[in-house]
Amino acid sequence: RTLHERWDETPLCGPNEHGDYCEDFFGGDLAGITEKLDYLASLHVTTLYLNPIFEAASNHRYDTADYETVDPLLGDEQDFRTLCTEAEKRGIRVMLDGVFNHTGAKSRYFNADGFYPAPGAAQGPISPYYSWYSFHPFPTDYDAWWGIKNLPAVNERNESYVNYIITGENSIVRRWLRAGASAWRL
């Protein structure tokens, strides 16, 4: 990750030494949004739509690494809760972006690079997440969003995946609604 000090610094153009794109970060966090709520309310803003806030390798965060963790560059769960509480006081709702048809290859669920200590789908059937993905054959080929291999597609009909994301008592959707989100963009 390249974290720039100022907004006018030149971003990296092209892949880094690992072949990854989108490694430039220009700051901005949940606490900063909270600080601007009075200004946003003065503009009659009623909804804040946040791009994905979950831990991810890229700056766009559509390659979710962990749905249970706010990306540390944005803050933490308490920062999110504070944002939602303070926004609600001003009549502003917070909408999260739910990227649930794929994860990042570098996620705790797929774990292509072995970064996480627990096995991901890339480590095979020993992983509780293996059935979330479709391999043809394992481990070299798998379904991916638009064929982009660092965005492995999930089987949205897999019962354990649906339970984890939507239907379970402590599902991701319910968890973040309880934390203060008002809506999801799917």
How should each PLM-predicted stretch be described?
Residues 95, 183-186:
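Short catalytic-loop micro-motif centered on adjacent basic/acidic residues
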Residues 1-46, 53-179:
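Substrate-binding/active-site clefts of carbohydrate-active enzymes
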